[in-house]
Design a protein with these regions (language model features):
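A structural signal for multi-pass alpha-helical bundles of membrane permease subunits
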Residues: 468-665
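Extracytoplasmic/periplasmic substrate-recognition and gating elements
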Residues: 137-140, 232, 240-249, 281-347, ...
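Conserved C-terminal helix/tail region of periplasmic/extracytoplasmic solute-binding proteins
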Residues: 375-446
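Hinge/lid segment of periplasmic solute-binding proteins
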Residues: 96-152, 170-175, 288-291
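Long, aromatic- and glycine/proline-rich binding clefts that accommodate carbohydrate-like moieties
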Residues: 126-131, 342-394, 398
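Extracytoplasmic/periplasmic solute-binding protein
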Residues: 138-153, 171-223, 266
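A structural signal for short loop-to-beta-strand junctions that line the ligand-binding cleft
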Residues: 89-90, 118-161, 192-193, 298-304, ...
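Glycine-centered hinge/linker elements that transmit conformational signals in sensory
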Residues: 175-178, 220-251
Length: 665
């Protein structure tokens, strides 16, 4: 077919122009000014934020503000990856615990030029986060401006269920026991006395401080202090709430605790100020926020971590983008906007001029929040805090699952924290092997080009002959290159480098040291064994079930179209939705799996998500469910391509069904 008109005018220039238009017409905002904000706000907070952004857009019609919600880890890792590539949002909003890492990496910039000392005086000291410059440690930089202070935990009580206020931990336990109800005697509680996200280390901090423990040594340094008698006592108390008093559901994460309290199935919840607005406005019950009680055995108050939530500026922003972004920050931290957030969400303001408002004295929630904040401890804004959380989580969750004692968990936390912090601050310098690898990469590339020179020559010749064809497949090639080939090669290079918290931008090739360290890890072989088991089991069941179902559907089965649709659903549904569904089914208290086990099989319920072996088994079952439909579709397509004459000839020759399957199928 010739690309020409009847009059001989070639259409190729027109086609090229059309393709270029289609490729670049969706390139985004071509005009105006754009500010991108990544945040971690709850739905209630987002509603208030959008209202304030609309007001800002009305005042600045030439500026477009795009606010995107990100989960905690998604924001942290996504911002790091974007910053490494020289991109990312102009602004990020969140708690101050990530700032130590971001500043050490050198991916956020000093906000002092837009907040001079005269403006800084308008804020309470805790609202402004200053950290040493990554370039000159003798100089400090303003890396976050907070629009609120606190971000702390407190106790919220459902007053329709509980009229008392616990002042001590013994009183809290007594009330929780009284409010924990199993109405039908089936062993499953319809209501709990106390719920909170006790599987995460951040939410156990009030129990640590109430027993006199802390995560770092009291000398102000960065040495962890996780293995102390006080910490063991705190973990013991949490474990007793679960196992002895049974007032909290097993594996109670944030979503479970939040849902139970909102549905009136819990009398008390420990949660942060970001959630109180939802509870106080819940039409199903009357809620009240009160300070956490005093630990009876020590007389110390349960003090949560207190942190600032605020805005930070991306180092990769251009001067013009930075100026626009800081104009937005100045608006969102203004007294007018903070009053709106304070009134609707019960947050404590960061501007000094708002601390004398009658609302702070008259509103019981704000009074309780201020009192709770006084009892709390400031969150350390250091890069090592990330290592503390990551070191606490495995042993703490193993403790809750019953595989470790409190003393063992505390000891393992301390050892892992010391190791993680040492690795974090380790500086690996390139040696001769690293320099040789750097040059060998370029030599390999040059050798590949020389080796494939004839193929490249044929490609260039074919390009001149079939430019339009290559232009059609160019978008697919670009996508494959950017999403598969480049990330793979880039990660291979990074695995040979000293890229770390201390060498985030100035990393160099050091050789195979990272691989050697992995092989030296004691856990390496256990993880390798699990990987082999995972691969073998999934492969057997994916192929086995897939082939079996494909053979059945390929035969004379009535309603095969309906069966095919039903069996393809696990593969068609997004994996994220499937994971959430199975997670709910494996829940210890309310999951369908345990309901079948206990009520129909009369066997004890299994803590699927609380123990390593059971959790691994649950993951395998979920992945089998996800994977077999794909193999079924592939096999069914192959079966339908086999000529039926082969089976007819085999039957004439007297071949059995197994022989037909083995020799033909």
């Amino acid at each position: 077919m010739s690309l020409s008109t009847n009059h001989g005018t070639p259409l190729r220039p027109f086609v090229y122009t059309l393709l270029l238009f289609l490729l670049f017409s969706c390139s985004g905002d071509s005009g105006g000014k754009l500010i991108v904000l990544w945040h971690q706000m709850t739905p209630a907070e987002r509603a208030v934020l959008e209202g304030q952004l609309d007001a800002f857009r009305f005042k600045h019609p030439d500026i477009t503000v795009r606010a995107l919600y990100k989960e905690t880890e998604e924001l942290r890792s996504g911002f790091q990856a974007a910053a490494l590539a020289g991109a990312g949002p102009e602004l990020i909003y969140g708690p101050s615990d990530v700032l130590g890492s971001f500043q050490t990496m050198g991916i956020i910039q000093d906000m002092s030029p837009w907040f001079p000392p005269s403006e800084q005086e308008q804020f309470v000291p805790a609202a402004l986060t200053f950290l040493p410059s990554p370039v000159d440690s003798s100089r400090t930089e303003l890396v976050q401006v907070g629009d609120r202070i606190g971000n702390h935990l407190a106790l919220v009580i459902n007053r329709d269920l509980l009229s008392e206020t616990p002042l001590t931990s013994d009183e809290m336990i007594r009330m929780a026991v009284e409010q924990t109800v199993d109405e039908d005697g089936d062993g499953r509680n319809e209501r709990y006395g106390l719920v909170w996200n006790f599987v995460e280390p951040f939410f156990v901090i009030p129990f640590l401080t109430g027993h006199g423990a802390w995560i770092f040594k009291e000398d102000g340094g960065i040495e962890p202090d996780l293995d102390t008698p006080e910490a063991v006592a705190a973990y013991t108390m949490v474990l007793e709430l679960q196992d002895r008093w049974k007032v909290i559901p097993a594996n109670c994460d944030y979503e479970t605790a939040d849902a139970l309290f909102k549905n009136g199935q819990a009398a008390m919840i420990i949660n942060g100020d970001w959630s109180w607005g939802d509870y106080l406005s819940n039409p199903g019950f009357h809620a009240e926020v009160v300070p956490l009680p005093v630990i009876s055995s020590t007389g110390l108050p349960m003090g949560p971590m207190v942190a600032t939530k605020g805005y930070s500026l991306n180092l990769n922003s251009t001067p013009e983008e930075s100026a626009l972004a800081m104009e937005l920050v100045q608006y969102l931290t203004s007294a007018e906007v903070q009053i709106t957030f304070m009134g609707q969400l019960k947050t404590l303001p960061s501007r000094k001029s708002l601390l004398d408002l009658p609302m702070l004295r008259e509103d019981p929630t704000l009074r309780a929040s201020a009192e709770q904040m006084k009892r709390g401890r400031a969150m350390p804004v250091v890069a090592e805090l990330r290592a503390i959380w990551d070191s606490m989580r495995p042993s703490y969750q193993a403790l809750l699952g019953g595989s470790k004692t409190p003393a063992q968990a505390a000891h393992d936390m301390q050892e892992m924290a010391l190791t993680s912090i040492a690795k974090m601050n380790q500086r690996q310098e390139p040696g001769p092997v690293g320099r040789a690898l750097s040059w060998s990469g370029w030599l390999l590339l040059a050798g590949f080009i020389v080796w494939q020179r004839k193929t490249l020559g044929r490609f260039l010749h074919d390009w001149r002959e079939n430019r339009l064809s290559y232009l059609f497949i160019l978008p697919s090639l670009v996508v494959i290159l950017l999403t598969i080939v480049f990330p793979f090669l880039y990660n291979v290079v990074l695995s040979l480098s000293n890229m770390s918290l201390r060498h985030f931008r100035d990393w160099e090739i050091i050789g195979f040291q990272n691989y050697l360290e992995v092989f030296r890890e004691a856990v390496f072989f256990s993880v390798l064994l699990k990987t082999v088991i995972w691969t073998v089991v999934n492969l057997v069941f994916h192929v086995g079930l897939g082939v079996l179902l494909a053979v059945m559907l390929n035969g004379p089965v009535k309603g095969k179209s309906l069966y095919r649709v039903l069996l393809i659903i696990p593969w068609a549904v997004p994996a994220y939705i499937t994971a959430l569904t199975w997670r709910g089914m494996f829940d210890y208290e309310y999951g369908a799996i345990n309901l079948v086990i206990s009520q129909f099989l009369h066997m004890p319920m299994v803590n699927w998500l609380g123990s390593p072996f059971e959790a691994f088994l649950a993951c395998i079952l979920t992945n089998i469910w996800l994977g077999f439909p794909f193999m079924m579709v592939i096999t069914l397509g192959g079966l339908q391509g086999i000529p039926q004459e082969l089976y007819e000839a085999a039957r004439v020759d007297g071949a059995s069904r197994w022989a037909q399957f083995r020799l033909i199928t």
